[in-house]
Structures are given as C-alpha cells and as structure tokens.
Amino acid sequence: MITASLMAALMAGTAGADTLREALVSTYATNPTLTGQRETLRATDATVAIARAAGRPEVSATVGLNRTLTQSGLLINGGKGPTVSAGVDLSVPLFQGGAVKNSVRAAQTRVEAGRATLSAVEGDVFTQAVGAYMDVIRDRAIVELNQNNVKVLATNLEATSDRFKIGDLTRTDVAQSEARLQLGRSQLATAQGRLASSEATYRQVIGHAPGALAPPPPLPPLPKSEDEAVRIALANNPDLIAISRSAIAAGYDVNVARAGRLPTLSGVLGETYVGNLGSTNAPFPNSGNATTIGLSARVPIFQGGLPAARIRQSQAQQGQVLEQVVGTERAVVQGARSAYASYDAAEKAIQANTVAVQANELALEGNRAEQSVGTRTIIEVLNAEQELLNSQVLLVTARRDAYVAGFQLLNVMGQAQAQDLGLDGGPLYDPLGNYRHVANNWNDWASDPRHPTVATRTVSPEEMPANPVVTPQIDSARIDPSPPAVTSGVTQPPQ
C-alpha cells in the first residue's frame, strides 16, 4: 500500500518545472555511487564462476624440444638428434572434501548479499537526492523571505529618516532601523550562501544543476507508531538482509577450511608422444606414444597446523559477521525510531509554526497601525517584523524536515528502492542479467567489452583545468556542460 501510494504520488508531475520524480530518474541513471555499486555486484557475480571452476575438468597440453649433449653406456647408440615430445593431460576432480560445494554456496550467498547491498545503496542515494531537492526548495524560499524582509526594512529606514527630518522621530529610531536593515542584509547573505551550498550538493547527487523545482508530491501514509515502523524495518531493511546473508556465507567458509584436512581424489587421462628427429643406430623405433589413465589421490597427514589455523580464522571471521548482524539490527531499530520521531516532531512543528505565522502577521499589522498613532515604538515594529520572518523560516524548515524524515523512514523500512518508486525513465537495472551471463560460464576466452563510465561528470568546460589531475576514460558527450546556475536535462538511464 505504501509503495503504490508513493509511485502514484511521484507520477503526478508539474508542468514547466523539474519534478522530484525527474530528479530521482536522473540520480538512478547517473549517480556514481549507485553505478559503482552495480559494478561491485558484477564483480561479486564472477566469484560464483571462479568457485565452480575449481570443480571442473582441466585440460592442458605440453610440448618440448630437447637435444642430447653427452651419452655413455647403453645410451651411446641412442642418437644425439633433437627429441620432440608432446602431451595432452586431462584431470577431473572427483572428491575435494566438500571444498568446491561450499565455496560455490558461499559465493552464491554473497551474491544475494550483494544484491541486498545494491538495494540499500539505492535507498540511501535516493534519500540523499530527496534531501538535496528539498534543501534547494527550502533555501530558495528562505532567500526570498529574506529578500522581502530587506526590502521592507529599507522602506522602514527611508520612512524613519523622513520622519526624523521633520522632528517626528529621534536619531535613536533611525539608528535602530539602520541596524535592523544591516542585520537583514547579513541574514540574506547567509541564506544565499546556504542556497549555493545546497545547489552544489544537488548537482553532486543528482548530476545536473537545479532549475525551477516543483513542490514534492505528498508522502504515502506512514506507520502509526514507532513499533510498527520497527517491525516493518526488521522484515525488509536491505542492510540487515545483506549482513544476514553474509553471515550464512561465512558459515560456508568454515566448511571450506575444514575440507583442507580431508583427502582429495582426481581422475587423470594422458596421451604422450616422443620422437627423435636425428639418426640413431639403435634397433628400436625412434618415436613412440603412450596413453595413461588412472586415479590420483592426495591424503594429507601433516601440514604444519595449516588446516587448524584456517579453520580458526574462518570461525573468527564468522563470529565477527554474526556480531555485525546484531550491530546492524540495532542500527535499523535506531534508524526507524529516529526517523519516525523526526517526522512526528516536524509535523507538530508545521502545525505550531503555521499558527505562529498567522499570529505574527496579525501582530505586525497591529504594531504598524499602533505605531502610526504613537502607541508603539519603531523598535516594537522592527521586532514584530523579525518575529514574523523567524516563524516563516521555521515553517519552511519544518516542511522540509518532515518530508525528508518521512522518506528516510521509508528507506529504513526498505521501501525506497527504484522498483518501489516506479522509475520508468528507462529500463531498471536487472542484477540477475549479469549473473545469468557469467555464473555458468565454461569458456576460458569469454570476456565482456570494456564498460564505459555511466556516471555523468558535473565539471563545466569553464571549470576544467588545463592539466587535470584525473582524466577518466569516459565519453565526453556525457559531461554535463551546464554552468552551476543553468539546468541541464534529465539523463535517461543506460540501455
């Protein structure tokens, strides 16, 4: 229900402005943290094929060319010409103490953990994108509020100066108005600096400069209590799923280490040819071949304590991961409770600050009216204007905090991944596709073409140094050419 509501909300766009959905589509396609994690999963997929290769037949060929330098005794008539030899050997592992079986299971389980980690990274990156989007909206609103405040204060100072000239007000009133105007300009400069920082973060996370941003869609209904949020998070959080699968894989590693104390058995088949290229006086043929077949067993008797050390090491590593499971569970519980509390507090702050803004608007209107008839002082009007500005800023901030905390709660509950958000700006990344391609590969010469860099760069041509320290091998067409204040289009996900 939560996922369906969130998908429907994100699909509702606003004409003429970038939407949160478009920002998330761009993030999904081009964020380097996310695209890098996909490559990490591809590397993990390959470990399954590596583990399986240890249990497959191995064929090798040998070729040799030798010349006899000295002969004595019975070999005097053997000839000194070059001798060529060639052979083909086939070795088939029959029993390896369960090492291959457990290695494959460990690799497969780590692939499952890698997929869960990819989901966790998706949720974390989307949460960063939502935070960056909401920060820009908040800071733009705060800058606008401060700009309006500076205009009002400048008008107040002008009016106060005029009234001072005719003797209606004192120099103190003018000084107070001047001081409050300079304070307003200081607050405006601070707000503009925060906006620039937020826009830079937006560009870093989402991949292009922010344009006009539409208000975000409403969040879906969230859990009614902290306990419900924790319960959902413990069942679906991808970080917890990933570490749990890693703990299972560590158990298979212990079995692999134990296999080092067991015998191994292999079947061998060989064909060998030897030929003498020179003349010989011996009454024997100068060439021949041989075919061999048999079993090769290796029975470890003493290995200097190596198997026991490996077992202890793998058991300790398993214990470490099991402890991490508990630590991750604690973090998930804390994250769910913290996000729920932050969301609840922000919602209450929205209600309180909405009332405060309305009350401060009435108070300011009353102060101005009373000051015009001499029952209020200039400083009281200035204070009323500052209190209104403060309450407006707090309201804008609370709205941002509520939305980000709500999305963070969705992320902790495992409901902020690409499939949950319905991002159809292109085909979603299929983690099973690469696994099917590589996990059962038998071909020694099979390889994939080099993967081009998918993530977009955010360096504009004007910012590029003459001798850059890092020159990644990427398609220059994927460099976002827009300057920081210009919006670039949303890049579609890679095909």
Q: Which ranges hold each PLM region?
A:
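Periplasmic alpha-helical coiled-coil/stalk elements that build and connect Gram-negative outer-membrane
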Residues: D124-A235, S342, A346, G366-A369, ...
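Acidic, low-complexity, intrinsically disordered peripheral segments
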Residues: L69, V396-Q495
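A contiguous binding-surface segment within folded domains or other stable secondary-structure elements
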Residues: E271, L277-S279, E329-N390
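Small/polar-residue-enriched beta-strand and adjacent coil segments characteristic
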Residues: T19, E58-V121, D239-T328, G335, ...
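Short, charged, amphipathic alpha-helical segments
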Residues: R105-Q108, R171-R180, R312, I378-Q386
